């Protein structure tokens, strides 16, 4: 089995689907993150060309990645005037730390939630709408 797949009783996770879930982004945004991470600070047009996507699609993905804290925008000043932006991905190790921390929080919250469930409340919730 691939190291990028995780089978659980409910589903099979891919790393990009896990990133999408943790960071609230689209699976397609993850490709943009890894392109920037691999190639270093990049302009939107360069990213779009490398991954064969429309500029506007890449712009939306980069905005999602910035909102999630995975990518930062930096202004580069041109010597004779003007500027342009490049986008830089946070290091992969930092991304992994955030994912692990988020998963630990989820796990702790789920354990607490299950611990606090009362049988009577669960029965009432799931059986009250059943017609006799």
Swiss-Prot record:
Signal peptide: none annotated. It holds the Pfam family TrmB. It comes from the Archaea. Disulfide bonds: none annotated. This is Uncharacterized protein MJ1503.
């Amino acid at each position: 089995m691939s190291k990028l797949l995780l089978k659980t009783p409910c589903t099979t996770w891919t790393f990009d689907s896990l990133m999408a879930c943790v960071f609230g982004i689209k699976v397609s945004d993850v490709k943009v993150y890894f392109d920037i991470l691999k190639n270093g600070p990049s302009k939107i047009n360069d990213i779009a060309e490398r991954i064969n996507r429309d500029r506007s699609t890449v712009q939306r993905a980069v905005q999602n990645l910035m909102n999630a804290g995975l990518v930062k925008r930096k202004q580069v000043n041109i010597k004779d005037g003007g500027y342009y932006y490049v986008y830089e991905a946070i290091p992969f190790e930092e991304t992994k730390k955030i994912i692990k921390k988020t998963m630990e929080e989820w796990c702790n919250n789920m354990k607490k939630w299950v611990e606090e469930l009362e049988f009577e409340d669960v029965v009432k919730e799931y059986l009250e709408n059943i017609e006799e």
